[in-house]
Structures are given as structure tokens and as C-alpha cells.
């Protein structure tokens, strides 16, 4: 774990090797989040607010409750509140380009976190690496199943950056294992535990031989694990998740499901604030700042429970 923290610290530090802006040049930051029901977004929000507060910066946070039109209206309002920088996590793919455009018209730098729009990207994009990490999660559950079986994949919100990358990574793992067949995909709207339960319940009934489930977020995986427990299946079903939510880490320790990829959500929040400060001062930051997630099982989960990155 100490080695991993050093790697994370290095990844963050290398983004800021040239120059630096004073926090005194930024007094107010706007933060737009898709929802505050997902632990992943809660951790980013808390990290941004705590770190900004230490630098004397006020953060105005708006929660779209997963509604793109609501988020656009909220961002329009943020642009009237004299913010110095805008931290943006799109609520969906459909309207993801509008808020950055509004901010640029107002001369406000944009830091996209977790999700980016190809046609209207942020001035910098901060995210956890998704393809390689999803590949590792799916490879792990496939290995647990002996390289054979039927899989269902429960996706996040269709078309957003994490969903696209995690799908790609898991599909790569499936392609490398001819004994595994992906029998069903289904997309969620909110990446939630309730959706994970209902989707998995329906798919397990339709495909009773399934022995592999990949939920593209820990909420989906935990819901799927509950559906597995309720299914009465006479064979072992291995479940993988993604994100390293605090509740999910404890569930892995308890054996509720098998594996996740823990993201450095708190490091991402701090990096977003530092990037905003630098951009507002006219400094340069990389177009993309990507931090690796870490494969997490019962063997190493304790370290992440005690000190989430």
C-alpha cells in the first residue's frame, strides 16, 4: 500500500512540474456533480471542499440528481456567481458539451473530472484510468471461475466516459478467454445498487447458467451480489465491481462480492483544485491527468478501508 501511495503521489506531482499559481488568485470555485447518492461523487466533493477550504477558497456545489437539463440550468446560475474556475462532472452524455461552452464564454477555466465531452472537453481532464483497470477486474473473476462460463455485464450510464472505457476493458478480458461467453448486457441510468439488483435478478432468471457478473460500479455490483444471494443458484457466481466505494470495500472484506478497482477519488479532488488554481492564473496543465485504479480483493482491502486514496 505504501508503494501504491508513492506511485499516486508521483502521478499527481508530475502534473505540476512547471510554475505554480497562488491560491490567493482564486477565491471561489464552482463544482457541478451528477448526483450525491453515489459514494464516488461524495468522496470527490468532500475532497474538493476540504482541500479548497485549507487554501481559503469557497466552493459552490450544485447537484443535478442525474438530470442533464437541471445541470445546465445550475451551471448557468453558477456563471453569475463570480466563480474563478469551474469543476465539472457531467450528469450525462447528452448535454455534456453545454456547461464547458457556457464557462468559456464567461472566461472561466474548466476542469472536467471523471467524464469528458470529446467535442467540448475541459481545459484539463482528470480521471481514473478505466480500460486497463476494468480488464483486470474482469480477468480476475474469469480466473476465479477457471476461465470458463457465462457472463452478464451491468453497464453504467450509456455513452459517458467511464462506461465506454470499462466496457472496452472488460471486453478485452472476455476476448482473451474463449471459454467465456458474454450472454447479456444491460445499461443502468444511475449506476445504483437498486438497479444492480433488479437488472441482475432479471438476467439471472433469463440465464440460469451465469457464473460471472461485472457491475461497472460498486453500487451495481453490490446490488448484483444481493440478487445472486437471493437467486438460490446451485453454483458459485463471481461478482466484480468498480470504484472502491467505502461500503463496497467493507463488503469485499466480508465476502459479499469478490473484487473491485479502487479509484483515488480524494487525490482526484485535490488535483482538480490545484489545476483550477493554475488555470485561473494563466498557467499550463496537461490536457489529461489520469490516475490508475488499484485491483482490490480481500487480500489487500484492509489498507484501503483504513486510508482511502
How would you label these PLM feature ranges?
Residues 2-7, 11, 15-18, 23-309:
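A residue-level marker of the well-folded mature domains of exported/periplasmic proteins
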